[in-house]
Amino acid sequence: MIQQESRLKVADNSGARELLVIKVLGGSRVKFGYIGDIIVATVKQATPGGVVKKGDVVKAVVVRTKQGAHRADGSYIKFDENAAVLIKDDKSPQGTRIFGPVARELRDKDYMKIVSLAPEVL
């Protein structure tokens, strides 16, 4: 469950290390973001020489949450951290590598490029 002011780790090599959520996209009544949701965030920590800098406002998709997700077959998946991947306007990732596992729900929400770059899909 990601909400305004939540801090997320960045799971790609775009240069950002930590994000602060400004807004969860999807309408005025959407308060919480889950796996596969798009967020608008600002970069709080960045690596030197990266594509994005500290203070940049970016869009990202949530790939891991501590709260987890219920699946149609009755199973439940949760991760150890909240993480996101920075995306461009056409929903393709800004980085060229994805670190750590991502949830299978991203495939259903049409983020195939992120799923193909990820080392593990759970």
Curated annotation (Swiss-Prot):
Residue stretches in coiled coil: none
NCBIfam families, per the entry: rplN_bact
Subunit organization: Part of the 50S ribosomal subunit. Forms a cluster with proteins L3 and L19. In the 70S ribosome, L14 and L19 interact and together make contacts with the 16S rRNA in bridges B5 and B8.
SUPFAM superfamilies in the cross-refs: Ribosomal protein L14 (SSF50193)
GO cellular component: cytosolic large ribosomal subunit
Pfam families: Ribosomal_L14
InterPro entries: Ribosomal_uL14, Ribosomal_uL14_bac-type, Ribosomal_uL14_CS, Ribosomal_uL14_sf
GO MF entries: large ribosomal subunit rRNA binding; structural constituent of ribosome
One of the GO BP terms on file: translation
Organism: Pediococcus pentosaceus (strain ATCC 25745 / CCUG 21536 / LMG 10740 / 183-1w)
Function: Binds to 23S rRNA. Forms part of two intersubunit bridges in the 70S ribosome.
Sequence similarity: Belongs to the universal ribosomal protein uL14 family.
Keywords: Ribonucleoprotein, Ribosomal protein, RNA-binding, rRNA-binding
Protein name as catalogued: Large ribosomal subunit protein uL14
Keyword RNA-binding tagged: yes
